[in-house]
C-alpha cells in the first residue's frame, strides 16, 4: 500500500493524504458474512452519554471476522482482499475446499490465490494459524489469543506484530508491539506474519469533515469551558488551569497519571512492562 498525496487546491486538501487502496481487489463484500451494525452515538441503554466524541458518520455493515482460526486441517485459498470500515487492517476472504467462506485479518504480503491453513500441523508461513507451542522462537505473529479457543485478542491493528521470544513450561514468552513481554499459554493460537496496511498510521486526515464521516465528533478543550463543565474551565481570558496537574472532566488526574490497578491479576503474566511513550 502506498500513500496518496493531494495538491493543495483548498485548505482541506493541503497536507491531506489517503491510502491508494492498491491491495484491495474488490469493493463487493461477501453478503453471507455481513451483519447489521446499529449506531449508538456513544449512548447506553438509558440514553445517557457514556463515550464522548462519537456520533454521525457513514452507515456501515459489520464484517464477521474469524479470529478463532479453528478450521483445522482444511486448506483454504485467498479469494479477495477487502477494505473493512470497522478496523484499520484490511481483511481477506478465504474459500475453503469444503465450500465454507470466512474473513480473516489480511497479513502483510498475503496475495490472492495463496493457500492458508490452521492447526498444529500447519506450515510456518504467512497467514497460517498455529498454537504458540508449535511456532518457532523468533517468529513474527499477530492475532494472539489470551485464552485457548476464545479467539485472537492481541495484535490486530494495521501494521502491528509481536515476536515469540521463548518457551517456559506451559507458557510462551511473547514481545508485544508496545514492548511489553508477556507470558501466554502455549495452547493459545496466533497467526504468522505482521498485520497488513502498515502505512495506515501515516495518513493525514486533513480536515474536520473527514473525521465526521468516520463518526468522530469534535473534542473541545476544557480550558475554554465554564467552571461547571470542566475543572480547567473559567477564569478571565486565557487563564491557566489552576491545578497542580491536568484533570479529566470528572476531576481525576490525567496526562501521565497511572490508572492501572495496583494488584492486577494479570501482573504475574507480565515479564516486562511496556515502554514509556
Swiss-Prot record:
Residues 1-23, 36-58, 219-277 are annotated as: Disordered. It holds the Pfam family Ribosomal_L2_C. It comes from the Bacteria. Residues 8-20 have a biased composition (Polar residues). Residues 258-277 have a biased composition (Basic residues). The keyword rRNA-binding applies. Keywords: Ribonucleoprotein, Ribosomal protein, RNA-binding, rRNA-binding. One of its GO terms (biological process) is cytoplasmic translation. One of its GO terms (molecular function) is structural constituent of ribosome. GO terms for cellular component: large ribosomal subunit. PANTHER family: LARGE RIBOSOMAL SUBUNIT PROTEIN UL2M, RIBOSOMAL PROTEIN L2. Belongs to the universal ribosomal protein uL2 family. One of the primary rRNA binding proteins. Required for association of the 30S and 50S subunits to form the 70S ribosome, for tRNA binding and peptide bond formation. It has been suggested to have peptidyltransferase activity; this is somewhat controversial. Makes several contacts with the 16S rRNA in the 70S ribosome. Part of the 50S ribosomal subunit. Forms a bridge to the 30S subunit in the 70S ribosome. This is Large ribosomal subunit protein uL2. It comes from Bacillus licheniformis (strain ATCC 14580 / DSM 13 / JCM 2505 / CCUG 7422 / NBRC 12200 / NCIMB 9375 / NCTC 10341 / NRRL NRS-1264 / Gibson 46).
Amino acid at each position: 500500500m502506498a500513500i496518496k498525496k493531494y495538491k493543495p487546491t483548498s485548505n482541506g486538501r493541503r497536507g491531506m493524504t489517503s491510502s491508494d487502496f492498491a491491495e484491495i481487489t474488490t469493493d463487493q463484500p461477501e453478503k453471507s458474512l455481513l451483519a447489521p451494525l446499529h449506531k449508538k452515538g456513544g449512548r447506553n441503554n438509558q440514553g445517557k452519554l457514556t463515550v464522548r466524541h462519537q456520533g454521525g458518520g457513514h452507515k456501515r455493515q459489520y464484517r464477521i471476522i474469524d479470529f478463532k482460526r479453528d478450521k483445522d486441517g482444511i486448506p483454504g485459498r485467498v479469494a479477495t482482499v477487502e477494505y473493512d470500515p470497522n478496523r484499520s487492517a484490511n481483511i481477506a476472504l478465504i474459500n475453503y475446499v469444503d465450500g465454507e467462506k470466512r474473513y480473516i485479518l489480511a497479513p502483510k504480503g498475503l496475495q490472492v490465490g495463496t493457500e492458508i491453513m490452521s492447526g498444529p500441523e500447519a506450515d510456518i508461513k504467512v497467514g497460517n494459524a498455529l498454537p504458540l507451542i508449535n511456532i518457532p522462537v523468533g517468529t513474527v505473529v499477530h492475532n494472539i489469543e489470551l485464552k485457548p479457543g476464545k479467539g485472537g485478542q492481541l495484535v490486530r491493528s494495521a501494521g502491528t506484530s509481536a515476536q515469540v521470544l521463548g518457551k517456559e513450561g506451559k507458557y510462551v514468552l511473547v514481545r508485544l508491539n508496545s514492548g511489553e513481554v508477556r507470558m501466554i499459554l502455549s495452547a493459545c493460537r496466533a497467526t504468522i506474519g505482521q498485520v497488513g496496511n502498515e502505512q495506515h498510521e501515516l495518513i493525514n486526515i486533513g480536515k474536520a469533515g473527514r473525521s465526521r464521516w468516520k463518526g468522530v465528533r469534535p473534542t473541545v478543550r476544557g480550558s475554554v469551558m465554564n467552571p461547571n463543565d470542566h475543572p480547567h474551565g473559567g477564569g478571565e481570558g486565557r487563564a491557566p488551569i489552576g491545578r497542580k496537574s491536568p484533570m479529566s472532566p470528572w476531576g481525576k488526574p490525567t496526562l501521565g497519571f497511572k490508572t492501572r490497578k495496583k494488584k492486577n491479576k494479570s501482573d504475574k503474566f507480565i515479564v516486562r512492562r511496556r515502554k514509556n511513550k
